[in-house]
Regions:
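Extreme N-terminal leader/anchor segments
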Residues: 1-78
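A generic structural signal for ordered alpha-helices
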Residues: 4, 8, 79-80, 116, ...
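Acidic-enriched, low-complexity/disordered segments with a strong bias for Aspartate over Glutamate
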Residues: 8, 42, 46, 65, ...
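Pocket-edge structural micro-motifs
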Residues: 72, 85-87, 103
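Repeat-mediated protein-protein interaction surfaces in helical alpha-solenoids
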Residues: 77-86
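Aromatic-lined, polymer-binding surfaces characteristic
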Residues: 89-175
């Protein structure tokens, strides 16, 4: 494909964007180039256990021993999960970061909590899954898992609070 064709395709894509979309695309680019400090906040949020109505369990994607299967591709991480894993593509990595496996049938509570704590160790340097959709989906999956299992952990709550605070500042007007 020639350079002129690529420029023509780009122009036909961007000419329909509204000014607010241009502004937020520039803001999103700036945030990628100069990421925010993702350290968890010092404040301890007030907490309330929610009562979720039983629902259809998620598909089994966590196979145990840090082994995951998404999109018919299986990966075993060994001792520590690589939360930035993109060898199978970004969609596979996003599925890993959604944490939907926490609410799959037969998920061991200790194993789920261990996976959350593993992610928390990675959180300050996290890049993958910090867009609004993965942030919001991960947050609700954590909330459901913690509430359904009666887990009250100050460290997990602080990181969850930091993720939700980050989400507030990442509105998706660029789409």
């Amino acid at each position: 494909m020639s350079t002129f064709s690529k420029i023509d395709i780009l122009w036909n894509t961007v000419k329909y964007l509204k000014p607010i979309q241009w502004r937020y695309r520039a803001k999103l680019w700036w945030q990628r180039v100069f990421p925010q400090n993702l350290q968890s906040l010092d404040t301890t949020p007030d907490r309330q256990i929610l009562n979720f109505v039983p629902s259809i369990p998620n598909e089994i994607t966590y196979l145990g021993d840090n082994t995951f299967q998404f999109l018919n591709l299986q990966k075993s991480f060994g001792e520590q999960v690589d939360w930035e894993f993109v060898e199978f593509g970004r969609l596979w990595g996003y599925n890993l970061n959604y944490f939907e496996f926490l609410n799959q049938k037969g998920m061991d509570v200790r194993e789920g909590k261990k996976l959350i704590q593993d992610f928390i160790q990675h959180f300050p340097k996290a890049r993958m899954g910090m867009e609004p959709y993965p942030l919001s989906l991960r947050s609700i999956n954590w909330i459901r898992f913690l509430s359904c299992n009666g887990i009250n952990d100050v460290d997990i709550d602080a990181v969850l609070y930091a993720q939700l605070n980050l989400l507030i500042h990442k509105l998706e007007y660029h789409l």
